[in-house]
Amino acid sequence: MSNKKADSKPQAKYPVNLLDTPFPMRGDLPKREPQWVKEWEERGIYEKIRAASKGRPKFILHDGPPYANGDIHLGHAVNKILKDIVVKSRNMAGFDAPYVPGWDCHGMPIEIQIEKQFGKSLPAAEVMSKARAYATEQIEKQKVGFKRLGVLGDWANPYKTMNFVNEAEEIRALGKIIEKGYVYRGLKPVNWCFDCGSALAEAEVEYKDRTDPTIDVMFAFAEPEKTAHAFGLPALPRAEGGIVIWTTTPWTIPANQALNLHPEIIYALVDTERGLLIIAQERVEACMADFKLTGRVVATAPGVKLANLRFHHPLASAHPGYKRTAPVYLGDYVTTDTGTGVVHSSPAYGIEDFMSCKAHGMTDSDIINPVMGDGRYIESLPLFGGLSIWDANPKVVDALNAAGSLLRSEKYTHSYMHCWRHKTPIIYRATSQWFAGMDVTPQDGGKTLRETALEGIDATAFYPSWGKQRLFSMIANRPDWTLSRQRQWGVPMAFFVHKETGELHPRTLELLEEVAKRVEQSGIEAWQSLDPRELIGDDANLYEKNRDTLDVWFDSGTTHWHVLRGSHKDQLQFPADLYLEGSDQHRGWFHSSLLTASMIDGRAPYKGLLTHGFTVDGEGRKMSKSLGNGIDPHEVANRLGAEIIRLWIASTDYSGELAISEEILKRVTEGYRRIRNTLRFLLANLSDFDFAQHAVPVDEWLEIDRYAVAFSQQLQTELLGHYEKYEFHPVVAKLQTYCSEDLGGFYLDVLKDRLYTSAADSRARRSAQTALYHLTHGLLRVLAPFLSFTAEEAWKVFQPASDTIFTETYYAYPEVAGSAALIEKWALLRDVRGNVTKALEEARTANRIGSSLQAEVAVHASGARYDALTSLGDDLKFVLITSAATVVKVDDEAQESVDVAASKYQKCERCWHYREDVGAHADHPTLCGRCFSNLFENGEIRSAA
């Protein structure tokens, strides 16, 4: 399409090739983007990408499912857009890279919403139906938000963990790990939330500061003679006293059952005003100061010598219910960093305490566990029955003081575990749960789960690389995985358990498959309504249905099984090439997926893990409601455009925190405009170019055109290397430099004279347009993964017959002979041009010239620069954008310089060059010779620029 402008008389008289384009200067993104979203959906663009990619090697980015609750936030936008960039860049690299989005649907947050709306007394069947409806509604809302961000995917057929087939396959996955021997039932302290009334996964725990009473408590001597002997004394100097512990959880004292010392720490027997006190020797001075006592060390002994001594419970004198003794056990976990070097053990409320007591022969039935699931003590607990443990804290302190056992009490602020949903403090609480054993030897006698998972980490590529050590440390040190939860809205652990022994039914694997078949037809509701007699007949008198549900991290952690090889196996495959999530997922989805795949398949479910950071404001502060520094992606999209969010994400190093503010968005918008203006220039100057009709063969191009294509091809190779490694911010940085400096600041700047003033169909102009055609092909494709709306908009102008840019692959530039030498030569020329531009600016500042075309320059150059400059001949002036340019040879670099002089000639009305031949043709007194030739004769001859 040709649109020659004729806005003024000179242009009408002596026209130049100023063309227009339907690609507007202003993006008007908030208005146009929703139109593209609608068009992509109506025209089935995602399906067309799949059709175009069919038969290519697969690349699978498996979507970590967001939770189906609430509006999408900026963190969602970061995650989904990064995934979109990966998928689009892999498709354009020649892969078949489908994107199946998914949602995590079961679990506490939705159950809480249902309880809030309808109360806690709903029948189970109603909880299920309302939870499904709620999750569906939330998914549809989030789906709209993700589409608005320009994310292409199979939105019509996402995976949902609540779909019947996924629920059924999850039960089958449970059967797999039971069959392999990883699952056991036992009493163990687990993270317990009183508000949830359930165990929590490690990933559901967050830490916040909390102020609690900290107390030092004395356990009185129960075996004075043995104690004296342990310290090498014939007898204790006095009867009063005991061993001293320090704790920040007074509420655990009623459940104390043991004391722990380190075998190698030296303990001192200190004579004080409160009697003889046993404290770690290196803590004596600090403790005496804290207790406001004076003390003399009577004797010392290593912890190992004190093993098995017994001491009275500190509340023994307060109530007969506490008349018991606590034995001394040895534990390597005891330190002298704080406290007394003695740890009191309530095995029901601490993992190390529990393991220590069990190792010393304590059985499950021996363990005292007076705290109920709602956080209250059992009614029968002496002194504190029925109290909340938090309300009991000060009362325990008072009782210890009254019993003469309290040495010190203070307020103490420490980092403490909280439920991520309720933001309330949680505890470790021993409950009977189902576990996946990290160090259990499986049925086949192979490696343990921990060993297999660590090997899986070694075989995985990490982006950035530091993620590897982080996940490795978590797996190496984690406890057994608590699989069970005590809720309704979740996939059931569909076991039949013996009413007396607690053993699983001998046909458990077969029964799980029968349940899975029913769930596949009717959902998890099928288990809720199942009469045990249907499956186990008369055994129903001996066995009961297990009421536990699976940890929701098992839901999402088995998507490699029930999605990649289940509901979406025709599109996806196992293992996935990439999992991509925020850095919190090292203890979340990355973690649970690794454990389940290690149990089921003996390998990791992914070949690569990509981790991104969290969003912060411009000052590096975490976004929060209290600070009022949150940024809503919907608001930004509606005000500036989703493209600006996409460009911000792509241009930020996601391996750290992603800073965003209005000032940052302003800079991103300015960068976007520069790219858009470059595209507009390219499209406008190609609007009268038909490649089939006007293309010039490569070997006939002008030299600068060959350079521009060779340079662009070299840049594309670099960019594709970055895309391959998921390094997006260097892609954006290099493309912005390319648009503003390599194109806008150099090549396109030089090209304007030839494009505008050469004869419309001349070889010189068509050579430039042929190069621009290739550059536009290449540029739009490398922009498309992140500037998706803009690349598509420009593509429809550039290639109107094509359905979409997203079915294209990266551009195959024509080969330019001697490209390396050409790039090297023009790097020298651009360097010289920079010096000339600086000299011209100085002359302009001194009012010696106006525009650069008013100048004539003499470039003094040596060596390779001299050779490069002289090789351009008379075309050098076009490269320097001056009316005349000469080259003067000098001996060395020290003598190089640029002389600038104002031209003494007249300015051509058409090309604005100052030339001696302006007015040489009497009929055209304001026209220079080359413009006359370009308009009325065969046109000027150019070879280089």
Curated annotation (Swiss-Prot):
A motif ('KMSKS' region) lies at residues 622-626. A motif ('HIGH' region) lies at residues 66-76. GO terms for cellular component: cytosol. InterPro entries: aa-tRNA-synth_I_CS (IPR001412), aa-tRNA-synth_Ia (IPR002300), Anticodon_Ile_BEm (IPR033708), Ile-tRNA-ligase (IPR002301), Ile-tRNA-ligase_type1 (IPR023585), Ile-tRNA_ligase (IPR050081), M/V/L/I-tRNA-synth_anticd-bd (IPR013155), Rossmann-like_a/b/a_fold (IPR014729). Its cofactor is Zn(2+). The keyword Cytoplasm applies. Signal peptide: none annotated. Keywords: Aminoacyl-tRNA synthetase, ATP-binding, Cytoplasm, Ligase, Metal-binding, Nucleotide-binding, Protein biosynthesis, Zinc. The keyword Transmembrane helix does not apply. NCBIfam families: ileS. IleRS has two distinct active sites: one for aminoacylation and one for editing. The misactivated valine is translocated from the active site to the editing site, which sterically excludes the correctly activated isoleucine. The single editing site contains two valyl binding pockets, one specific for each substrate (Val-AMP or Val-tRNA(Ile)). This is Isoleucine--tRNA ligase. The lineage of its organism: Bacteria, Pseudomonadati, Pseudomonadota, Betaproteobacteria, Burkholderiales.
